[in-house]
Design a protein with these regions (language model features):
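N-terminal secretory leader/proregion of peptide precursors and effectors
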Residues: 1-3
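Flexible, compositionally biased loop and terminal segments
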Residues: 5-182
């Protein structure tokens, strides 16, 4: 491992803000495998993953990124052993409940994407409380993808557009539909 001789402040000054992405997405993958390699249970790795999210969020805010998406739980994750699913859901509830004050203090607006209706009731409730509590923050937006897949996203987009066409919110002309997708 090579270390950098420059202090963080000097590195931050070297960042070209005009070339900085506005949105960064991170797929949370490998935490369980890492834990097993270290001789721990998979859930230990997931709990350490929370620290990685904190660090990524702090760094993203510090350099001026406006949106950070964390792909935390995909629809495929329901195929894991039940004890691991339960542990992940408990970790989600615990983390959200314990981080909401810190999110507020740091100007972080929390939102979510995915089929959150498919999550356990306690997860939905804690998530919604945190979303509501941070809704007026705008330094950076943390988007948590939960019960998410690309297929779900496509189905959801088609359903939303179809409903808007039916209610005449958007015109069913080709150009109007294309603009709705962008």
């Amino acid at each position: 491992v090579q270390t950098c001789a420059l202090p963080i402040s000097a590195l931050l000054q070297k960042i070209d803000k005009d070339r900085l992405p506005r949105h960064i997405a991170i797929i949370m993958d490998g935490n369980g495998r890492w834990a097993k390699q270290q001789g721990h249970e998979r859930l230990y790795g997931h709990s350490i993953g929370v620290e990685s999210v904190r660090a990524a969020l702090s760094a993203a805010k510090q350099i001026g990124v406006k949106y950070l998406t964390i792909y935390a739980f995909s629809t495929e994750n329901w195929n894991r052993p039940q004890y691991e699913i339960d542990g992940l859901m408990n970790l989600l509830v615990y983390t959200i409940a314990n981080e909401v004050d810190e999110l507020n203090a740091n100007g972080v607006r929390l939102t979510s994407i995915g089929d959150t209706d498919g999550l356990p009731a306690n997860c939905r409730s804690e998530l919604q409380k945190a979303i509501d509590a941070t809704s007026n923050k705008n330094d950076i937006q943390l988007i948590i993808a939960l019960n998410y897949s690309s297929r779900w996203e496509i189905r959801h987009a088609i359903k939303t557009i179809s409903e808007k066409v039916k209610s005449n919110e958007i015109n069913s002309s080709k150009s109007s539909l294309l603009n709705s997708l962008i």
